[in-house]
């Protein structure tokens, strides 16, 4: 896919839902205000159980591959096989904006091989959580948990709350909520 030129584009990828998360919508608005010419692509497709869903998702992976190959930045909110399992160009910036607030429960490499975790061999074959440039964490306190879960060292951790948390500290949002109550 390196045949296609890289554009002024950011691609958001999610397996959590078939629609944009609130965090993605808030980022989209903020980016549009700051850089209206930047193309934003949203590839949101929930990976469901069942063979037909998985076959359908395989076709979606090709779409992901194209947009990842032609983007300067990719933002994820969960594991993405197209990012992790395939070789990426060095200039690609991949940001893991994990969908959960904080690290209350264990996930990723923290539970590989355990009951609720992935099989260690599968995690290795699918290069689970590879090729990330930055991993967003809500605080320095959570950073070691995220580093363990994603298998990265501290230099990849960036303390930055999710956009929906920023919304809670926005006075106009609070005033609007009070008016509606």
What are the roles of these predicted feature ranges?
Residues 1-63:
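N-terminal pre-catalytic "stem/leader" segment of glycosyltransferase-like enzymes
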Residues 16-19, 47-49, 80-82, 100-103, ...:
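Short, solvent-exposed loop/turn segments at secondary-structure junctions
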Residues 20, 42, 94-98, 150-154:
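Tryptophan-centric aromatic hotspots in well-structured domains and transmembrane helices
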Residues 39-40, 72, 130-135:
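Short active-site oxyanion
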Residues 105, 110-111, 117-181:
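A nucleotide-sugar donor-handling region in carbohydrate enzymes
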